[in-house]
């Protein structure tokens, strides 16, 4: 039987924790999060749990496991997103049920702006092996604890990077005043 395993600290990407996200394969929408671990993070407990799930499903002889079984441990370098580090591991964990979500004081997080792509967290997950349209090992998301803030991943540039300052027509730059300056 699968047990909850605590992840090391990770950076949050693609959080679908307040409402289920879109299913990649057109299947049922699920809650989930992509966990971006730092290079060198101790993933031994997660690896052991994934192996346990595989042994439970397919037996101890790994040569008899499905040849093209999906591996839950991915290289962040496979994705071309800001904040993804080639050679570091990422794992996606999903759930049919909304995960519990707390802050460092173990208080529920209900404000969606408090938990975002780019913040830091840890989670409890359960490994399971599956055989349906495909075969593999995955992690079920149980609960999440936010550990800190980080630079948000937004997928967009700041407005100030898109535009140059503009001086109104007919006004020299030195004459340009702010609204507050008009009354002084």
Predicted regions and their residues:
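Acidic, gly/ser/pro-rich intrinsically disordered tails
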Residues: 1-4, 151-184
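OB-fold ssDNA-binding interfaces and closely related basic DNA-contact patches used
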Residues: 1-90
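Solvent-exposed residues in well-ordered beta-strands and their adjoining turns
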Residues: 36-40, 128, 147
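A short secondary-structure junction signal
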Residues: 46-48, 102-104, 132-137, 155-156
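OB-fold/S1-family single-stranded nucleic acid-binding modules
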Residues: 131-151
